[in-house]
């Protein structure tokens, strides 16, 4: 991490969703309950950096992305973008910032309007934000964005409809549309999870190139640690609304400290077939986010849990240079 202020800084973010009690619950005056989707999360993204937020389905990754993008309101905490806490801004003040914050969605088959040709889909952000300009200016930006997204020659795609494209091509169209506004922050929510394996690497390499060639920061949401290890600068591992480990990507992969991270890595295929790793099968399902377990929220599934883990809720503790993990065993090892 540099001494320069980060492009994006999330501080103690909490996002909850109320649970309806129903008629019986109201009559019995049962207390109101809430889903704790994000529970005290802090992270940062620097310019020119790719940060991967990793975890199982239901851990709160996507809700984190939606809260950062102001698609979902934060319950508490702050999201600092370019020095401003965007959680406090009204729609009018937020609008110009949206130009510099773009999101790529998971499903390329639903993110594009089937009625729009590729040309119209890519130009739409300019129209929405009133930045269309002259026809010649639009064409220059259109061709540039298409080329940067790997859709070359652009003329081959501009008049096609989404149903005439492959999944990888659709995702590249979505990326091209996001580039039309020259964003400084790009949030990629599982950008390749619905694509064929044969085209995933191409899309990820594209994102990596966008990050490395300029000042764009990328927050990539993924459940795939192998993808994160290969492309991200830093990895943040999330479980049940909280960060359980964070650090430089290589360090987290080579020297995982939290039992949950170790379990995720144990099922990642190895390049060297001679490298034998015993998969760690986690027992049970992720607990209900309405009823968070006491103590360490991972203890019901943890293979090394101790009695104290049911009581102590560990904070992130140093596990190496810029490397932290939330586990009492890590705290002990580094005292």
PLM features per residue range, with description:
Residues 77-85:
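Conserved ABC transporter NBD signature motif
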Residues 161-165, 169:
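Conserved ABC ATPase signature
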Residues 191, 195, 199-277:
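P-loop NTP-binding/switch modules centered on Walker-like glycine-rich loops
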Residues 180-184:
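A short, proline-enriched helix->beta-strand linker immediately N-terminal to the Walker B motif
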Residues 3-6, 19-29, 34, 155-156, ...:
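Short catalytic/signature loops enriched in Gly
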Residues 84-85, 136-156, 209, 265-266:
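Conserved ABC ATPase "signature" region
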Residues 54-56:
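The feature captures the beta-strand-to-loop junction immediately N-terminal to the Walker
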